[in-house]
């Protein structure tokens, strides 16, 4: 294993984590692919976030002119959005989002993209027009092709011809022999 060439991939919560990883440890990770990531859990599914990440409660007590107390409750998500980590990011991030994703709204990715652009960071991004949270058919093939090319370029320094990786080709050959 070459510890100087480490890549990470994740989808959905894993997409959040792969982007967080390359932003948190930019000298360790050489490449990351993040698809459909919930990069900003302040706008993601509140029930999921509260159960899996937790919520902090801040109570502020004030008194009015008559001495009557009132309390104000403020809640915040414990896990930081990737936008806050983006300042550490150096290189190697490829982002994907489905244009009609109703599970993780594309705004999660666009908020991260906005911060990366403002910080003049180099990254790549694709919006898959016909995709919801999962990528299927032509979009899935396109996604896989771009992901493998990204890893080949950054981890293997291979900028040669198209990368044609069919993970099932051996299985397909075996089925044809039967």
Regions inferred by a protein language model and the residue ranges of each:
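Active-site-proximal cap/loop segments of hydrolase catalytic domains
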Residues: 1-178
């Amino acid at each position: 294993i070459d510890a100087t060439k480490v890549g990470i991939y994740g989808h959905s919560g894993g997409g959040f984590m792969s982007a967080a990883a390359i932003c948190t440890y930019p000298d360790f990770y050489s490449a990351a692919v993040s698809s459909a990531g919930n990069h900003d859990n302040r706008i993601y599914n509140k029930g999921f976030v509260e159960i899996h990440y937790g919520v902090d409660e801040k109570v502020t007590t004030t008194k009015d002119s008559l001495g009557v107390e009132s309390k104000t409750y403020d809640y915040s998500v414990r896990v930081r959005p990737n936008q806050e980590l983006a300042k550490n990011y150096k290189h190697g991030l490829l982002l994907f989002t489905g244009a009609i994703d109703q599970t993780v709204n594309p705004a999660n990715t666009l908020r991260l993209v906005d911060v990366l652009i403002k910080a003049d960071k180099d990254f790549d991004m694709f919006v898959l027009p016909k995709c919801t949270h999962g990528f299927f058919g032509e979009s899935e093939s396109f996604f896989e092709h771009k992901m493998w090319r990204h890893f080949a370029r950054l981890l293997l320094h291979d900028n040669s011809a198209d990368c044609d990786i069919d993970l099932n080709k051996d299985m397909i050959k075996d089925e044809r022999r039967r």
